[in-house]
């Protein structure tokens, strides 16, 4: 009896020790570090940063004849607020512009003519420079456009990141038609919408990269010659006919081909682009009371700039308040 008690006690202790080890192993296997398939805790993905103005590439198309007449006005007004984002594409060197713009003046090898090949040549230069920049948005305007950077940024921020975006204002109330050459001397009639370059338009990088087979390098001019249409039409053709995309029409872009006086003063800060010019034999400008008279400011761009940026030093009345 005395010999059996220690042996039984030892067995009980051994059993308890084994059970304790099993429990410890069980709990260790259930810990987050040991359970297979359980991901490690991590910070949530913040996603792409919010679009800022420095993410936008603004291309201005011009020609030698308008360097003084139009470009200096833009440099004094809206370009002064978007200097780092704006690139001016022209056909001739200009020492004065070079001093003001530096590397943001792009002198192309394009003709100064107002022809389909010359216009497409400059658009191709704009597109290639944008692709090389790595920026998120490409926006094209002409040298008679005023760009409101605040309204532009608000518009572009509204589009989903995953979507191909082509936004602008069509100049026609119907699609344009073109003859697309086919093999065996045949042609195919195609129709598509396009945003008029005279009002400006924007394309995001996601879509621009898909356009490259028809738009990068000399291929943009080749595509334009193929359908015998100018640069802005060629953009619409590539996007809608080659890629199956669609123009997103926006009433916030404006050219000199519309009646600009219909815009109310209260609406002006919301517009992405505005313009001026002669339409149907009459001066076509926005209707705006401002610090400058129509004789001092025939385009009304200086008065508009003082409305949007009253802190501008040369705004005589609003700046003094």
Swiss-Prot record:
Binding site for Mn(2+): 144, 256
Cofactor: Mn(2+)
Domain of life: Eukaryota
Signal sequence, start to end: none
Compartment(s) where it occurs, according to its Swiss-Prot or TrEMBL record: Golgi apparatus membrane
Chief site of localization: Golgi
Residues annotated as catalytic: 232
Topology term for the membrane: Single-pass type II membrane protein
Binding-site list for substrate: 70, 143
Membrane side Lumenal: residue ranges: 28-321
Cysteines engaged in disulfide bonds, as pairs: 110-121, 139-202, 306-315
Name of the top EC class for this enzyme: transferase
Residues bearing attached sugar chains per UniProt: 109, 185
Alphabetically ordered keywords of this record: Developmental protein, Disulfide bond, Glycoprotein, Glycosyltransferase, Golgi apparatus, Manganese, Membrane, Metal-binding, Signal-anchor, Transferase, Transmembrane, Transmembrane helix
Molecular function (Gene Ontology), one example: metal ion binding
Cofactor note: Has some activity with cobalt, magnesium and calcium, but not zinc.
Spans within the Cytoplasmic topological domain: 1-7
Transmembrane segments: 8-27
Function noted in UniProt: Glycosyltransferase that initiates the elongation of O-linked fucose residues attached to EGF-like repeats in the extracellular domain of Notch molecules. Modulates NOTCH1 activity by modifying O-fucose residues at specific EGF-like domains resulting in inhibition of NOTCH1 activation by JAG1 and enhancement of NOTCH1 activation by DLL1 via an increase in its binding to DLL1.
Name this protein carries in UniProt: Beta-1,3-N-acetylglucosaminyltransferase manic fringe
UniProt lineage: Eukaryota, Metazoa, Chordata, Craniata, Vertebrata
Gene of this entry: MFNG
